[in-house]
């Protein structure tokens, strides 16, 4: 499966647009880690627990999007993007989305 942020894939042409595909996940940190993160914001610096949580969430959302594209028989997802939003304190939604397409080699 080819995943690209561009609208075209070098060496291929889009034969068929199958539709928008997406994958999302909402994740939160453990309360104890959330309290530790609050103290970290006072001192400054990277909050590693949240960085790890968001990295994991992006990977899960991407895998879910790929599964949706595979169900449609896609060769690629073009125009790929991530979006994130805060659901509540310590919880975030990550959305991976793009356009599932069939490709033809040129």
Swiss-Prot record:
Signal peptide: none annotated. It comes from the Bacteria. SUPFAM superfamilies: YbjQ-like. HAMAP family: UPF0145. Belongs to the UPF0145 family. This is UPF0145 protein Tpet_0165.
């Amino acid at each position: 499966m080819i995943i690209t942020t561009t609208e075209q894939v070098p060496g291929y042409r889009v034969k068929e647009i199958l539709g928008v595909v997406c994958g999302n996940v909402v994740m939160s940190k453990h309360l104890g880690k959330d309290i530790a993160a609050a103290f970290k914001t006072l001192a400054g610096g990277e909050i590693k627990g949240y960085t790890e949580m968001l990295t994991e969430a992006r990977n899960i959302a991407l895998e879910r999007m790929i599964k949706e594209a595979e169900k449609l028989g896609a060769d690629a997802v073009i125009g790929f993007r991530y979006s994130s939003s805060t659901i509540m304190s310590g919880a975030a939604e990550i959305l991976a989305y793009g356009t599932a397409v069939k490709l033809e080699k040129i």
